[in-house]
């Protein structure tokens, strides 16, 4: 398997699709928000990128959950292995592509996870606490658990932080069992984008998404009966656009806050990927500004050296 990672706006999908077209691979997404149906513009699905030379590249784990629900890491790990095992049995090359570092690391390392029920008493005790207060509690729990899960990338709202605390608290009294998920051997390619170029692309992409109907997309989700707090839970575009629609922010306030949040998110993504290197992953960094054919040649040279496709 080949894994392609990188921060938002680094061109992961187009590179993964072009590489998959060259080697006959199918793509498994590793994006914690693209799993949701009808959340297309805000999550940046860019499904047109999966068409290369008029050929549609098969992709998986996109549009598999209903908006308003809370898809989680445990579910992703199960769904990943269902698809992975099927593709392997058919001897299909696989490209794992996404910016959710926790999802990528969990499937490559084979983290032993279990479904964690909600704890109403704990949730009530955490109500009213600020995000910074919740983060301090989470850091302490992670230290006690020796946990690498729940990076700031994944807890950018109070609801997410409370859920992370709930999981870490559960793990303290329910140690992970002996059975591990199988580790997955993979060549990892990281897309490295210049900071200034990344910031420019993020800002332009945000303008494009707003011009192409992102506000209308969020309105339609609200009109379908999804509570505002459920959309705010998803963070970033869905958080700030929802706050704009319900009157908590002006358009200019929404744009400014969202732009800052996405820049911070991209920075945290890179922090996670650098942390993966410290935790023993070898990542082959590729300059995203290179022409696509040079990127493909880079990947093929690595495949020629390591021959890690399945």
Could you describe each region identified by the protein language model?
Residues 1-310:
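Phosphate/pyrophosphate-binding catalytic cores of soluble transferases and nucleic-acid-acting enzymes
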């Amino acid at each position: 398997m080949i894994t392609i990672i990188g921060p938002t706006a680094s061109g992961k999908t187009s590179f993964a699709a072009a590489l998959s077209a060259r080697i006959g691979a199918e793509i498994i997404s590793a994006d914690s928000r693209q799993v949701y149906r009808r959340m297309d513009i805000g999550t940046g699905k860019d499904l047109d990128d999966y068409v290369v030379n008029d050929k549609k590249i098969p992709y998986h784990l996109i549009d598999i959950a209903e908006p308003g629900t809370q898809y989680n890491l445990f579910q992703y790990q199960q769904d990943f292995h269902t698809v992975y095992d099927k593709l392997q049995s058919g001897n299909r090359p696989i490209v794992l592509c996404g910016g959710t570092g926790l999802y990528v690391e969990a499937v490559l390392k084979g983290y032993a996870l279990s479904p964690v029920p909600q704890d109403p008493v704990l949730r009530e005790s955490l109500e009213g606490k600020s995000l910074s207060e919740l983060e301090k509690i989470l850091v302490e729990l992670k230290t006690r658990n020796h946990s690498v899960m729940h990076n700031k990338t994944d807890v950018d709202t109070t609801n997410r932080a409370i859920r992370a605390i709930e999981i870490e608290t559960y793990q303290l009294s329910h140690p992970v069992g002996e059975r591990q998920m199988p580790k997955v051997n993979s060549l990892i390619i990281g897309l490295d984008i210049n900071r200034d170029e990344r910031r420019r692309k993020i800002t332009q992409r945000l303008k494009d998404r707003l011009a192409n109907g992102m506000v209308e997309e969020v309105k339609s989700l609200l009109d379908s009966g999804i509570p505002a707090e459920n959309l705010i839970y998803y963070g970033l575009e869905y958080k700030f656009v929802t706050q704009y629609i319900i009157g908590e922010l002006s358009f200019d306030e929404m744009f400014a806050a969202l732009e800052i949040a996405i820049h911070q998110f991209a920075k945290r993504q890179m922090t996670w990927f650098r942390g993966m290197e410290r935790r023993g992953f070898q990542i082959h960094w590729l300059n995203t500004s290179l022409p696509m054919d040079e990127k493909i040649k880079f990947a093929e040279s690595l495949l020629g050296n390591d021959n890690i496709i399945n």
